[in-house]
Amino acid sequence: MFELRGAPALSPFRREKLLKNIQEQAPEVQSVYAEYMHFVDLEGDLSAEQRTVLDRLLQYGPQGQSEMPSGTLFLVVPRPGTISPWSSKATDIAHNCGLTAIRRIERGVAYHVGSSEQLSSERRAAIAAILHDRMTQSVFHEIAGAELLFAHAEPKPMTTVDILADGRDALAEANRSMGLALAEDEIDYLTSAFTELGRNPTDVELMMFAQANSEHCRHKIFNATWEIDGEVQSHSLFGMIRNTYEQGGQDVLSAYCDNAAVIKGGQGGRFFPDHRTKIYGYNVEDIHILMKVETHNHPTAISPFAGASTGSGGEIRDEGATGIGAKPKAGLTGFTVSNLNIPGYKQPWEGDYGKPERIVSALQIMLDGPIGGAAFNNEFGRPALCGYFRTYEEQVPGVNGLEWRGYHKPIMIAGGMGNIRASHVEKKDISVDAKLIVLGGPAMLIGLGGGAASSMDSGAGQEDLDFASVQRDNPEMERRCQEVIDRCWQLGDDNPILFIHDVGAGGLSNALPELVKDGGRGGLFELRDVPNDEPGMSPLEIWCNESQERYVMAVAEQDMELFDQLCRRERCPYAVVGSATEELKIQVSDEYFANSPVDLPMSVLFGKPPKMHRTIERKSFTKPIFDSTTLDLKEAAERILRLPSVASKSFLITIGDRSVTGMVSRDQMVGPWQAPVSDVAVTTASFDTYRGEAMAMGERTPIALIDPPSSGRMAVGEAITNLAAAKIEKLSDIKLSANWMAAAGHPGEDEALFETVKAVGMELCPELGITIPVGKDSMSMKTVWEEGEKQKSVTAPLSLIISGFAPVEDVRKTLTPQMDLSTPSKLLLIDLGSGKNRLGGSALAQVYRSVGAVAPDLDNPEELAAFFACIQKLNNEGKLKAYHDRSDGGVFTTLCEMAFASRCGMTICFDGLVKDRTHIARELFNEELGAVVQVSEEHVDEVKTCFADAGLADHVVVLGEPHADQSVKFQHEGQTVLGYSRGALQKIWAETSYRMQSMRDNSECAAEEFAAIDDDNDPGLSAKLTYDVNEDIAAPFINRGAKPKIVVLREQGVNSQAEMAAAFDRAGFSAVDVHMSDILSGAVSLSQFKALAACGGFSFGDVLGAGEGWAKSILFNARARDQFEAFFHRKDTFALGVCNGCQMISNLKELIPGADAWPRFVRNRSEQYEARVAMVEVLDSPSILLQGMAGSMMPIAVAHGEGLAEVGPEGAAALMAQKNVALRFVDNYGRPTMSHPFNPNGSPLGITSVCNDDGRITVMMPHPERVFRAVANSWRPSAWSEDGAWMRMFRNARVWLG
């Protein structure tokens, strides 16, 4: 082994934050410096030339300090005995560069901690705990410790539990020590089963049974029988959910039997490459919609980043593994936590009840968890388009007396939708001898016992077991797996997949038995064929670990050659680990130890111990009245705007890519000022249609503290009023996912759960004609701990989170909260609460530390159905200019958010609504269902008539009107009872987000964004074009029939190739899918092409720098280098690099004539991934792609973490002077800017695209290919029809080729 120092691992900003963290534990620490250390394991010597290549490979990131840093060394490295995902990718890159003498490269971080006195062993331990993740990393105080990275561990043997000698007691002890979470009747069942088999169980079999039969996996409570007040109930909880399908399952193609539900979609052209020719094309067919929503609550409480990240990853795998292979498309995320208690910003309703040591604080969850969820989606390439965020923690009355209710065990929701072919919805039969395959990453000792651990109340397990049950993520690997699945489903009837499942809770021990059971077979497996990056693991650890990014599948023997080709091209690892058998038995042999860790009849593993039976008695309690009549309106309004469920969610949104796929039509950000106020997400079905899909969420959990069934009805109602903004043909087109969280067994909670499921499943949804074809439950929502002598607990309210999905008729007709001030208009409230104005469970009650006695409710489902039909009709007729539903914070919040989205003011009059001023608070802040619509004055009567004809005449109230003057006034009897400037109101609403952003990211950037809210004159996004957006300058060339081929180039981890291909296809090119493996193998030569586009994503997961690993595998591979150099030097070629492709090509500048002065692109100034819509100016440059566009200013999608052009002031000025700069960021006034977020990455002079001297090679960080359609722009001028402004760039390319 030898080591090589690398770049600084932390920016000055991150270093300062870390120092403050460490000083809380060790005040004597004065400095900290961190740099990467690389460790290289060789099986032969490197030549001098190879050593140079290695040195250059490991030079990435910012410049480090040359002298050795001083201070105590904390060397953080991957846990010895494991191979990190970073190592696998870096070693692959090294091998691609011809460095085959390298066995492995591994990376650690050397932290040098300077202190005023020698650190004690206790202090060292405390600092080490801050610096590393003990699940996946180790800490050494000497470099030599890293030698252990390459040591070879001997496998550990299995053990058995001696029940033949010690009986049931032996199993009960194993249950406790192994954290199996077996119920008493399950212990009896297993004791009996193995006694009958005449042998002792192995530890592997016990863990496998525990995972397969955990509450997490088998949903025992939802399948239980119930007795209430002595009366046996006729339905289980699951039976009541299924009732919605039995009553109205039309257009549901798959429910309750697969990883996700499938519902009917519309027709369109699915755009993908032909397997044989690799040319992209449209395949017109039914594009059905799949829907899934998961929770990952337990892991997120323990380790928020990893918990949320793997939660998203697991849900994405569920979608991909639907039917016999499907395509995930768009994601949603939600969080519910206890009070944030932001330092220096503590709110009047926030107390400090404490928490157990083993879980992190609500604040830490919300600083780290959302980044984890967003990072996985970003790297995988799935846009995150909607969600929710709620905090709740309060001492309230219940059947148990006064007790603390809240979310110390958080809710982390990961969900989404995708598409699937009609012929792939049903899984196929598994043939005897079919190959059983693990696709994806290797086994590692992470996430052990996650299914069982998440089934226990938080605090009931041992802390080490808690931590061991959290998985770790590798999204780039999952992307590779999905590419293989994509290649399979794109083959249509020749799809080689017979059956597929994702690997989740319980690891292979759950996934493989489930695969063969569902396929009607048994399975014979060889343990040592499981890919394993941790050779020292025991059989239990190999079989049961929850390493992520894995799928299991069955492939017929005759299709293995095809499947192998697909995997090799995508560089996706797979292994045949067994074969399907006629005998219904699971047998796992272990050739290393020559034994069988598992040898069980399927009937034992899946045979059920007695079904759970739950007996409850109804109880009641006195609910104190919440009196709002004496409240100060101004104080109440400001408190509500600061409550996280109401406040701006910007800090949760801009971290997530919302443009990838090029099919996003409506994300959270609305209008020219990109206000985070949309409650519905809308995507197009493909690039050739206006049909699409919509999704939205609904949840009103605090209501459950006083009226659980109401909370369920209100959650469903909110999802519907959110979805109503999209153009959906009929209410029954909406299908719901229901995620149920409860503290089962806690007094009153079983009754709350049963009654709410009944209200939703047996009553409300059947009345509305709506089906719930998918869902999830988490039944252990209670945290218990000891503080001194005191026993403490925090119990979550019953929590139903609804996610609604529907096909959309026309994505162009999605309504938003942005108002149109071009003609006089009125704002109308449609009040589905019938003037009852109930305040129980409201934001108003919460900010005054109350919960109230009477909750809002959906009293009349027929009225909700009529409301939905009216909104759809009026939208179709063009009578509605804006729409926003009423929810958290009441109509006050609804109106404020409409003003923020429109950068305008409004005058609202309550004269017709309240006679007595003391009732204004109830009118303003009640959270009854409803919506506010903006209607032109000329259409007000027609709109009222429409609602009257639907029986809703008494529910429509004219509230007032919007106006350009930015004052927001609420008036009663001629007096302003509440008045603000729009800017002042918006800053109150945005401050919670700003504070979180300041703590998490570069605080200077957060402050600049916050300050920009004040600018009343900010014109917002605009499009000032020097060309006609609707002119097709490529038409004459397309009409000749010639379609020049363009290489749409990708590397492993790239995720934006489809939209790039679609844009060039529309411009008259024949887009060819080319993987770097095609070039390196010699299967494809660039000499055959005149055009190349390098796409965005995360090649190699950004290992060795963003785009740098990809570039170096070209620079240091003779075949690839020669091809790229020749291509760049030919005068008849052009190339475009976008985002990751830009980062890659900029690192190839030594091969490109006239690119000497190009910058590299490094970490954003904000220190955060930035997903924005930014204004750019097209500069006068020789870029052949931007000819005729100079002087134009228009919006463009931005989504990257490393886009800052690394060039000094002189270098930047020189690039400008030489006309090598093609695009630069400008603010909304059209001025070049350094200010955040108008310059999202902080590049000097706003530089975000450069070209070479002759203009043939252009690279840019923003994404024109994602917004080539007008409908794919988050905001667009109304004059645009089909084409967006950036389509001209692709047509310029076609014109240049002639």
UniProtKB/Swiss-Prot annotation:
PROSITE patterns, sorted: GATASE_TYPE_1
Signal peptide, first to last residue: none
Main subcellular location of this protein, as a coarse class: cytoplasm
Matching InterPro entries: Class_I_gatase-like (IPR029062), FGAR-AT_N (IPR040707), FGAR-AT_PurM_N-like (IPR055181), PurL_large (IPR010073), PurL_linker (IPR041609), PurM-like_C_dom (IPR010918), PurM-like_C_sf (IPR036676), PurM-like_N_sf (IPR036921)
Active site (UniProt): 1139 (nucleophile), 1263, 1265
GO-annotated biological processes: 'de novo' IMP biosynthetic process
E.C. number: 6.3.5.3
Binding site for ATP: 307-318, 887
Reactions this protein catalyses: N(2)-formyl-N(1)-(5-phospho-beta-D-ribosyl)glycinamide + L-glutamine + ATP + H2O = 2-formamido-N(1)-(5-O-phospho-beta-D-ribosyl)acetamidine + L-glutamate + ADP + phosphate + H(+)
GO molecular function: ATP binding; metal ion binding; phosphoribosylformylglycinamidine synthase activity
GO cellular component: cytoplasm
Subcellular location: Cytoplasm
Keyword check for DNA damage: no
Ligase as UniProt keyword: yes
Pathway this chain belongs to: Purine metabolism; IMP biosynthesis via de novo pathway; 5-amino-1-(5-phospho-D-ribosyl)imidazole from N(2)-formyl-N(1)-(5-phospho-D-ribosyl)glycinamide: step 1/2
Residue span(s) of domain Glutamine amidotransferase type-1: 1046-1298
Keywords: ATP-binding, Cytoplasm, Glutamine amidotransferase, Ligase, Magnesium, Metal-binding, Nucleotide-binding, Purine biosynthesis
Oligomer status and interactors: Monomer.
Matches recorded under NCBIfam families: FGAM_synt, PRK05297.1
PANTHER family (alphabetical): PHOSPHORIBOSYLFORMYLGLYCINAMIDINE SYNTHASE (PTHR10099:SF1)
Protein family per UniProt: In the N-terminal section; belongs to the FGAMS family.
Cited function: Phosphoribosylformylglycinamidine synthase involved in the purines biosynthetic pathway. Catalyzes the ATP-dependent conversion of formylglycinamide ribonucleotide (FGAR) and glutamine to yield formylglycinamidine ribonucleotide (FGAM) and glutamate.
Protein's recorded name: Phosphoribosylformylglycinamidine synthase
Highest classification ranks of the organism: Bacteria, Pseudomonadati, Pseudomonadota, Gammaproteobacteria, Oceanospirillales
